[in-house]
């Protein structure tokens, strides 16, 4: 089996030598199944060998057309125990975001590839000199139409397909149609994006990750009770009203995918520059619009552990909070 990871990866730490994990697909009391999505709790420990692991930090952020270097530094983080860094952006400004991201992620990581569809963007970073491990890299994009192109905030998706150290991965960053009533339209957009950007041959992808502003909202709950529950740290009550999970339960989207528990507060909509929810005349109902989902194609060959799934509340430059996931892969019997 191929050798993955680096000695500084989060799975190379020796603090948790006795931790044992179940392969994805056999999560016991820490998981709940839907027809479309398996919801799993993140674990804070890892027993993967430093010679047989690949750790990936995945970040999605709707930037609302704004950028500051300080926000990007906070986004990337100072602790770099991951191998690959995947950053998906929506409503990215016309400023040279890729250069700022490269500066923020140096000196530990370098840009391996990027994909852009105007304001929908995706960046993939690897450890310095890791480009030698890249056997294939392809960037693709798909537009779902609309007038977003006229105002520089396009809806659609971009993808990076990569073979990194013999692990074939597809990362898709997308921005779907807004507003609570457009559930069916979002479902249709997801199907069109999948048909366009995912390889037909499933053997060409060991790991598939969707990230982005998927724009699914809280269904049939008005603004005041939603905000009251969040204020009292009872946002978990709202999970059953999440449109994305509801559509997954109906079998409409993301069949066979996994997502971390929605333990963090809804990531939209905030007053820019603060952690206060929207007080404008629109007064949007808070929602988990920003999500990260993943799927292992063959769990007999590769196991996955989700180590974190959370929002990054210390970023204030947008009306969305970023979301990050730390995912580690392990070859079975390596």
Swiss-Prot record:
Signal peptide location: none
Pfam families membership: Exo_endo_phos2
Membrane topology: Peripheral membrane protein
A GO MF label: phosphatidylinositol-3,4,5-trisphosphate 5-phosphatase activity
Reaction(s) catalysed (UniProt annotation): a 1,2-diacyl-sn-glycero-3-phospho-(1D-myo-inositol-4,5-bisphosphate) + H2O = a 1,2-diacyl-sn-glycero-3-phospho-(1D-myo-inositol 4-phosphate) + phosphate; a 1,2-diacyl-sn-glycero-3-phospho-(1D-myo-inositol-3,4,5-trisphosphate) + H2O = a 1,2-diacyl-sn-glycero-3-phospho-(1D-myo-inositol-3,4-bisphosphate) + phosphate
Keywords (A to Z) from UniProt: Cell membrane, Hydrolase, Membrane
EC number(s) per entry: 3.1.3.36, 3.1.3.86
Protein name from the UniProt record: Type IV inositol polyphosphate 5-phosphatase 11
Natural source organism: Arabidopsis thaliana
